[in-house]
Amino acid sequence: MLGLFNYNYLIMKYARLTKEQFEELHQEFINFLATQSITAQEWSDIKLNKPEVAEQELDVFSDLVWEGVLKQVQYLEHISANQLHLFHCLENEMRLIALKVKNQDIDLTTKEGFNWFRDNLLSDDVEFFSAKKTYTEDKALDKFKLIQQGAVITKGDLFLYFEKLVSK
């Protein structure tokens, strides 16, 4: 056992951060190691002589970062070629506003397609749907699964805009 964690039972809940994300969070990772009384020299030794332990430390840190981020998520968006899914993550439920473009020639992931969408928003070629869903036992994991499927964290501008249209 190293530090605070028993690695015999460690299973990642989320996903390992990318190399770029680790580089961005370099100081936070140093602080994470320090909370476990692991010095820079000891970390170098662990990476060299116990790579499986180093991998597990990276996984634990990744999960801690994800947990913190997911607690803060209020809005998610997933844009595909013909659909727009906008999520508002409330305390006890997730609200969804979905928009579907019937015209298969329109691709919302392109500038031209999104401009068409904006100009034809109230036409019969665009369908609106809304729904609510209560979370499972693990609200953070519900959000993470949406991110894994391609949703991105946003400030909610699109959700708030379309919420006004849908409620009229």
Where are these regions (language model features)?
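Charge-rich, low-complexity intrinsically disordered segments
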Residues: 108-126
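N-terminal amphipathic/basic-hydrophobic helices that include classical n-h-c signal peptides
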Residues: 1-11
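Long, charge-patterned amphipathic interaction tracts in eukaryotic proteins
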Residues: 54-112
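Generic structural signal of hydrophobic/aromatic residues within well-ordered alpha-helices
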Residues: 42-43, 61, 65, 69, ...
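Short coil/turn segments at secondary-structure boundaries
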Residues: 42-46, 77-82, 132-133, 158-163
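Glycine-rich, aromatic-bearing surface loops/beta-hairpins
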Residues: 121-168
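Non-membrane alpha-helical secondary structure
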Residues: 21, 53, 57, 61, ...
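N-terminal interaction modules that seed assembly of large macromolecular complexes
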Residues: 13-78
